[in-house]
Amino acid sequence: MSRWFANPDAITAPDDVEWAPWVRYTRMPPVYDAPGTKEVAAYTPEEQALNSSVHESGHAVLYMAAGHRINSITLDPADGLQREAQASIDYEPGATGPWLDFVLKDAAGERAETRWLHETGRWTPGRAWVAERHAWHDRKHADEVVRTCHGRELTFNGDHGDWGDYAWIMDRADEALDPVWEQVLALAHYVAEHRRVTGEEAARITGFAR
């Protein structure tokens, strides 16, 4: 078992779901001494662009490694005011397969982001917390997959032996990222440089057949 921290300052979310576990809980303790997550992370524009590209490339590579397809990855630039550079994936619709393919894809973004922070010497407890808080949409989707496929709610109990607990899913995502980590980095740098990458380009860069 490992401890999770409840974050009472729920991030922006619809009123009816903002206190759901996939929004509230983080493995890193919450940070309250800054106006928002942007100030806690304190990235340069170049760091933020690459950080977001790594996050989305983690999703994309595990998804493609499982035999699924994406249409594109797009990195929207910062607007110079409030919005930071933010990458997103357009997934090819209609994918089917084992439930684990989809929850590992969901967890891979924040796990790739955290790994990149460690490997590049950028990791801080605050930045790790920000990575988790920004991943609530991914965690929500993982919850939906577990509910649909198994009729149970995704838990945040820190139970590394329970396949329905997010700690277990994060561990499996870490393991799945190990053999494809170089592909994740290669794709991330390409996204950060080119801003938009087609599914065909992503498959070529990572070596996965399309």
Please identify what each model-predicted range represents.
Residues S2-R210:
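Soluble catalytic regions of large protease machineries
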